[in-house]
Amino acid sequence: MEKGMIKLKSTVILVLFALLYLLPLNGRWLWSPDETRYAEISREMLQRGDWIVPHLLDVRYFEKPVAGYWLNNISQWLLGHTNFSVRFASVFSTALSALLVFWLALLLWKNRRTALLAATIYLTSLLVYGIGTYSVLDPMVTLWMTAALFSHVLIQRATLTRERLMAWGLMGLACGMGFMTKGFLALALPVISVLPVALAQKRIKELLLFGPLAIVVAVLLSAPWALAVHAREADYWHYFFWIEHIQRFAEDDAQHNAPFWYYLPVLIVGTFPWLALLPGALRSGWAERKSSPERFLLLCWMVMPLLFFSIAKGKLLTYILPCFAPLALLMAAWISGLAPAVRDRLLRINSWLNLAFGSVLALAVAALGLGIIMPHLYQPGEGLTIVSGVVCFVGWVAFAAVSLKKSRSWGYLVAGCPLFLALLVGGSIPASVVDSKNPQTFIRSHQPLLEDSRYVLSDEVGLAAGLAWELKRSDITLFKARGELNYGLNYADAADRFVDEGAFPAWLAEKRRSGNVALVLKIDRDTDEEYRNLPAPDQLKKSHRYVLLFYKQIAP
């Protein structure tokens, strides 16, 4: 009976994973700038056959190392030129992280129910789901940080020198791959997480003795590529270390500057549909640090990165994704250890929180659709889009309501709360947002004109990357704004990849002699103010914030 229930729960989790993570993956447009950027970088890597130096729009792009791109490359190589392939590496990394969470729970507590619950909490947490189905590098670096956490547990449990060497070697492999995915950050997070555990358990000597092995392994793993990219591009490491790391995280003008408390609401919303478990799980990690040292270890791996990112001036909500694997383990362990009556009461509180959360969001979408708030977000004729958005959260409410049934196992049905959101969100985005963040629709609507253009320009890197991806050509020229390609455009061989607004009329007059020209703009407002002073086009196509100016070839 017990084995049968475990098999049933495992099957349900696999089906839920497929419905949440795989089925909707190809049905959503790529978001700009992140998804269009990573899609195009890997497309160009495959096209060029260059897996060493990343390029975007044929311009050097030094913002990240290459391991994340490699996973994206493999996905596109195996699965083709689709939105599914663009996002699959993120989903694959999230699935492997969930497997590590499952195995780690089994290792720590020898209980398959707790292990399944930990994996379920991880996969269905709102922030994990949102980032895990989105093409960015954070799910991949999270995979390696979860592997580093797993290695740390192996280190703690090792009794023989050989076991310690193996565990520290695995830590080095995980850190090395993390470094090759997102840089020095992947070395800092394990250090700040391991150190308080070593101090609390008086194992500093062991850390100093065996820790260098992890460093050596990480260096050996990353050295071939690090040396190869240096040989090809001598200033890669200067840019990557000083600009990408020091300026982004520490300086006053850091990119994505945000206050210290920024991650508190992100954490609260991101843990839905399991929010009620958060306070007790964190408290137990500290309160039971002596009786259950593994919980203190998990607490350190959750809290220390969170503090690190909170102190850093540059912040993005994706940064704290590595905190969710240890948090899911803490939650599963804590609720599994409660007395049945207390557990049932907690699950009911959790269900009510989800009921309130879903209701508020359903009402918010309805208010947006009716124009009560932000009256210009939805346009006339978008009734189905509004209904779809409301149903996303009505589904959340429905699962929360069903989970309120007075039966011990029903409380866990909140795991299904994100299901309707996952399946319907692609059809719930208002056209005004699609035509500012999802360039694929606009590009496909005017693909014949764009494909008939010898020269294609864009005033935003994310939009330009979307054009390159859809048209399968990397020679998109940037117009007026350099954006994140500013550094790469300073190279002499990239001088012709940017056209200033003042120089555009003369540039256009010259280029029109050899072919059609298409200029695609993303304007700030739904007016002609930003392009009225440009040379008059032969055709003008506009949809909300996207504008296409088409100039026909003229006789020489």
From Swiss-Prot:
Organism expressing this protein natively: Pectobacterium carotovorum subsp. carotovorum (strain PC1)
Keyword list, A-Z: Cell inner membrane, Cell membrane, Glycosyltransferase, Lipid A biosynthesis, Lipid biosynthesis, Lipid metabolism, Lipopolysaccharide biosynthesis, Membrane, Transferase, Transmembrane, Transmembrane helix
NCBIfam families with a match to the protein in the record: PRK13279.1 (NF009784)
Name assigned to this protein: Undecaprenyl phosphate-alpha-4-amino-4-deoxy-L-arabinose arabinosyl transferase
EC number: 2.4.2.43
Principal place of residence: membrane
Catalyzed chemical reaction(s): 4-amino-4-deoxy-alpha-L-arabinopyranosyl di-trans,octa-cis-undecaprenyl phosphate + lipid IVA = lipid IIA + di-trans,octa-cis-undecaprenyl phosphate
Compartments (UniProt record): Cell inner membrane
Role according to the record: Catalyzes the transfer of the L-Ara4N moiety of the glycolipid undecaprenyl phosphate-alpha-L-Ara4N to lipid A. The modified arabinose is attached to lipid A and is required for resistance to polymyxin and cationic antimicrobial peptides.
Gene name, Swiss-Prot/TrEMBL: arnT
Protein family per UniProt: Belongs to the glycosyltransferase 83 family.
Listed InterPro entries: ArnT_tfrase (IPR022839), Glyco_trans_39/83 (IPR003342), LipidA_mod_glycosyltrf_83 (IPR050297)
GO biological process, one term: lipid A biosynthetic process
